[in-house]
């Protein structure tokens, strides 16, 4: 589960901060 969360974190930050 942790590995999945770490994999999704960059995309989440990308959506939140609009820095893709």
From Swiss-Prot:
<keyword id="KW-1015">Disulfide bond</keyword>
<dbReference type="InterPro" id="IPR012520">
    <property type="entry name" value="Antimicrobial_frog_1"/>
</dbReference>
<keyword id="KW-0044">Antibiotic</keyword>
<dbReference type="GO" id="GO:0042742">
    <property type="term" value="P:defense response to bacterium"/>
</dbReference>
<keyword id="KW-0929">Antimicrobial</keyword>
<dbReference type="GO" id="GO:0031640">
    <property type="term" value="P:killing of cells of another organism"/>
</dbReference>
<dbReference type="Pfam" id="PF08018">
    <property type="entry name" value="Antimicrobial_1"/>
</dbReference>
<keyword id="KW-0964">Secreted</keyword>
<dbReference type="GO" id="GO:0005576">
    <property type="term" value="C:extracellular region"/>
</dbReference>
<protein>
    <recommendedName>
        <fullName>Brevinin-1DYa</fullName>
    </recommendedName>
</protein>
<keyword id="KW-0878">Amphibian defense peptide</keyword>
<comment type="function">
    <text>Antimicrobial peptide. Has low activity against the Gram-positive bacterium S.aureus and the Gram-negative bacterium E.coli (MIC&lt;15 uM). Has a strong hemolytic activity.</text>
</comment>
<comment type="similarity">
    <text>Belongs to the frog skin active peptide (FSAP) family. Brevinin subfamily.</text>
</comment>
<keyword id="KW-0204">Cytolysis</keyword>
<feature type="disulfide bond">
    <location>
        <begin position="14"/>
        <end position="20"/>
    </location>
</feature>
<keyword id="KW-0354">Hemolysis</keyword>
């Amino acid at each position: 589960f942790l590995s999945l969360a770490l994999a999704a974190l960059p995309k989440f930050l990308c959506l939140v901060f609009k820095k893709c």
